[in-house]
């Protein structure tokens, strides 16, 4: 018993533990079953949702991803198209502004000369040449050279091309500065003026070159822009020269800077295209073209105005420094004066390009007003007792001229159909001829006027020009008005005649209708009468036929009675 009890006591804990383990295992199995059931329920729910609702949250995410991808693709395509279109746009833009950059840059570099406002000072103070010799014996050769080479370059440009002439002119401009830097001999100074005139005559050929390289409709805009570039070059170089002079730098430095800009202009000219006339050069054709242009009254009118106005302007530009030197006996403000004159003039030079064809209706008024205003300003320059009055007069005068000059040049270019270079050069030659005559008249050969009195003379020339053109434009206006009135009267007469002829025609038509109507009535009456006569005749015939029938009947009765009687 004891052994069995021991065994039982020993077995009890094991059984207890086994029972506990069994209970635990049972609980764990139940938990696992519950978890499995929960998982199955969740899976069933998910499957139900996925089957019945097609997992919309996943579709929304997929749609958003697709939209984002599509947007990214569209953005990438837009960027690619933008960059692909950007390069052609840039190329086309540069092709459009390429002539503007080339021509305006060349004009700017050509005119960029800081030493220009101080040349008289350089001649007198640095080289030691007398002022009277400067403006009576040295400066006139610029005009002579300009005149001769205009004719030569105008003809050569059509043979060898305008580009070659422009390059020759820039080489001559560089040689001009080389002569100024190397010697003070008067003969060499005269040679320097000859090369300077040669370079400016080549610049005139450059203006004709612009006309050849562009459409006629674009020439006025480009001419105004090139003129503005020229003026900006003068303004900026004048300010630079003034600053350098105030820093007590020698004038030789200014000439060296001008030489450098001329070399840059020469390099730029080497890249120009070479335009020339396709037809062979013939002197007879050139002469015939020149005479043909003078058959056009409009061209003659513009030639006369430009000849006188340009000649006076060239003289004023050449001698204004001498005038200020006599007024103030110093040239410390010449840089500011020159820069101000051309700075404000550059804005006025652009105005005609903005107005376009609107300015054609008031051209005559503009030319007349310029003569009056410009002449008064030149007289005021000569009369001015101070540099301020003379400087203000010079600035306003220069603005007026630079405003009118592109208008005249464009009008001349529009009237010309061929040989633009020769005819442009001939226009300047007319101006230079007048300039030589004016300089000879005021010089020591004839009147021997001092510099102040010369400006009175120049102003009087513009006054006469203005009055002459006022009379001419007034005559043309009256002629046009008379012609318009005569045309209107003739139109009224024509209308009256047409009205009378229409009345006559209508009366004749009425008469014809009446005659036709009467004739129809007469014909109708005659037809009625004829019809009546015919009817009467028919009736008579019918009566005769009836009588004959009666007679025949009677005869038949008699014969029949005899038979019966028999």
Curated annotation (Swiss-Prot):
Keywords: Coiled coil, Folate-binding, Membrane, Transmembrane, Transmembrane helix, Transport. The chain crosses the membrane at residues 148-168, 171-191, 194-214, 226-246, 252-272, 304-324, 332-352, 364-384, 388-408, 420-440, 458-478. Residues 27-40 have a biased composition (Acidic residues). Gene3D superfamilies: MFS general substrate transporter like domains (1.20.1250.20). GO terms for biological process: transmembrane transport. Residues 24-81, 517-544 form a coiled coil. GO terms for cellular component: plasma membrane. Pfam families: Folate_carrier. Its main location: membrane. It is a multi-pass membrane protein. GO terms for molecular function: folic acid binding; vitamin transmembrane transporter activity. It is found in: Membrane. Residues 25-46, 526-566 are annotated as: Disordered. Residues 526-556 have a biased composition (Low complexity). InterPro entries: Folate_carrier, MFS_trans_sf. Folate transporter. Belongs to the reduced folate carrier (RFC) transporter (TC 2.A.48) family. This is Folate-like transporter DDB_G0272544. It comes from Dictyostelium discoideum (Social amoeba).
